Amino acid sequence: MSTTDRVTTPTPTVSGTDAPGPDASHCHLVVVGGGITGLAAAWQGMARGARVSVVESDDHFGGKVVTDRRDGFLVEQGPDSFVAYRPAALKLIEELGLSDQVIAPGGGRRVSLLSRGKLRPMPAGMGMVLPTRMWPFVTTTVLSWPDKIRAGLDLVIPRRLPDHDVAIGAFLRQRLGDGIVRRFADPMVGGIYGAGIDELSLDAVLPSLRDNERDHRSLMVASLAGGRASRRAARQRAAQNNAQQNSSHQNSTGQNNSAGTRGPAASPFRTLRGGLGQLIDALVDQLRAGGVELLVNTSVDLLGRDGVHLSDGRVLPADAVVLAGGVASSARLLRPQLPAAARALAQIPLASTTIVSLAWPVSAFDVAPDSQGWLEADAGPVSGLTASSIKFAGRAPDGSVLMRVFVPDKRGPLTDAPDDELLSAVIDHVRPLLGVHGEPGLTQITRWHKVMPKYTVGHLERAAVVDSTLAEQRPTWAVAGSALHGVGLPDCISDARHSADEVIDAALAATPSAPNRNAATDRTETR
C-alpha cells in the first residue's frame, strides 16, 4: 500500500529537441508502463506542464533496468550501460542532476572473441561488422587466412543489393564471405538484438551498409575511410582540448604542458556510479515530487473513448496516451480499436535471454583477470561474458571479481533449463576459459522471457503500419519503447520523449482552448 500526493515543484529544465512546446496544463497524459520508456515519457509530459499518470503492472518501476545491491556487490539484472554517442540518455541524466555520477569503463583489455576454441583479442579498430583499420584485421587470429582472402574480394565485387529489405547475414555473405559473418557480425550484432544474423533486417538494424554499398561499392573501402575520418576528428578534438588545458595551466602556473600522451580509443559506453537503477530511482523521486501520479500493481484492461480502464475498476480520463509496456501489452490494448496496428505489433518476434551473475575471489584464478569479457563466435549455449567489476568501478568488493554470463534462447534450450542445471552448465563452460577454481561465492539468475523485440526482415514495414495507423486514426495515442525504433537505452528515452510530445500536441490541437474537464479530479490515490 502506498500513497501518491501532488506537490508543487518547478518543472524540469530541458532544451534542444526536448524543449517543451505549447503549455499543456489542461492535458492529461496517461503512460502505460513504468520502465525507462514510460518514465521518460512521463518526464517529458511533466516538462510540458501536463497532468501525468503512470500505470505499472509490476510492483516496481524500471522494467528491465534492475540494479541489485547485496553483500558489497552491485549486480545489474538487465542492461549495464548505454552508448554515449546517442545523446538522449546523457541529456536526461543531466536534467536529473546526475551528470557527476556518470562513469566510463575503467582499465582492463577490451573484449575478446571465443573463436575456434580459443579466446582471441578483438582486432583494434573493429566495428560491429567491418574493420576501420586494415593491419589489425590482416593480422588477427580470429579469422583464418581463407576467410580474410574471401573478405578481401569485397574490394572488387560489384554492387548487388536489391531495393527490398534483406537479412544482414545474406548480404554480408555475398560481399564478405561466411567467415566474417560467423566470427564477427553474428556474435556482435546478434548479441545486441537477440536474434541470429540471418533473420535480422538490414534496413532496420544496419541501414548504413546499404548506403556504403551505394556510395562506395566496397564495404571495406567505406569502413576504412570512415575509420580514418573518425581518427582525424578525434585527434583534432584532442588537440583542441590540450590547447585549452595548456592555456589554462599556463595562465595559472606560467608553465606549458604541451607534451601529450596518446592513449587508447575511448570507450563509447557509460553508466552511473550506482548502477542504472540510480537513473530509475532519480526519475521516480523527481516525478513524484513534481506531482506525477505513479501507480504500481495496476494493469490496464482497456483503452476506451472515455479513458484508460484499470484493473481495479477505475477509469483514468486521458487526453493523450503513451503505450510503453512492451510489444504484447501494446498489441493487446490496441486490438479492439486498431486491429491493423495490433496485428503489425504482434508480428514482431520476441527473444528470451537469461543472465547468470557469478563472483569469485581473485585468489581463485590462475591469473588475475584483466579483460572486460568476451563474445562467443563458436557454437554453444553462451553468447558472451562481461567482467562487470573490471568494466566498471564499484561493482564488487576488493578482492572479488563479478561477472555476467549471457544465455540467449537463440543459442539453444539451456536458457529455459532449471536453475541448478543452468548454473552447472554455465560454470562448467566458463571455468576453463577463466582459469578459475572452486565454486563462485555469489550466484544470481535473472530470466527475461519474451521481452526483447527482434528486428527481423520487414521490420520497418511493420513499424510503419503501427505509426501510420495511430497517426491517422488515434493521433493522441502512441507506442513507444524498444518495439519499433531502437532497442538501446538512449533509443527508448528519445522515442518516449518524442512520443509524449506528439500525443500532447495532438490533444492540444484537437481542443486548443478547452480546459480539461477532469483537471480537478483528485490526484491522491491510495492503493
Swiss-Prot record:
Essential cofactor(s): FAD
Organism: Propionibacterium freudenreichii subsp. freudenreichii
Localization per Swiss-Prot or TrEMBL: Cytoplasm
Pathway this chain belongs to: Porphyrin-containing compound metabolism; protoheme biosynthesis
GO molecular function ontology, one term from the record: oxygen-dependent protoporphyrinogen oxidase activity
Main subcellular location: cytoplasm
Reactions catalysed according to its record: coproporphyrinogen III + 3 O2 = coproporphyrin III + 3 H2O2
Biased composition (Low complexity): 1-14, 236-252
GO biological-process terms attached to the record: heme biosynthetic process
Main function: Involved in coproporphyrin-dependent heme b biosynthesis. Catalyzes the oxidation of coproporphyrinogen III to coproporphyrin III.
Cofactor binding note from Swiss-Prot or TrEMBL: Binds 1 FAD per subunit.
Renumbered residue ranges of the record's region Disordered: 1-23, 231-267
EC identifiers of the protein: 1.3.3.15
Protein name: Coproporphyrinogen III oxidase
SUPFAM superfamilies: FAD-linked reductases, C-terminal domain (SSF54373), FAD/NAD(P)-binding domain (SSF51905)
InterPro entries: Amino_oxidase, FAD/NAD-bd_sf, Protoporphyrinogen_oxidase, Zeta_carotene_desat/Oxidored
Family listed: Belongs to the protoporphyrinogen/coproporphyrinogen oxidase family. Coproporphyrinogen III oxidase subfamily.
Listed GO CC annotations: cytoplasm
Record keywords, A-Z: Cytoplasm, FAD, Flavoprotein, Heme biosynthesis, Oxidoreductase
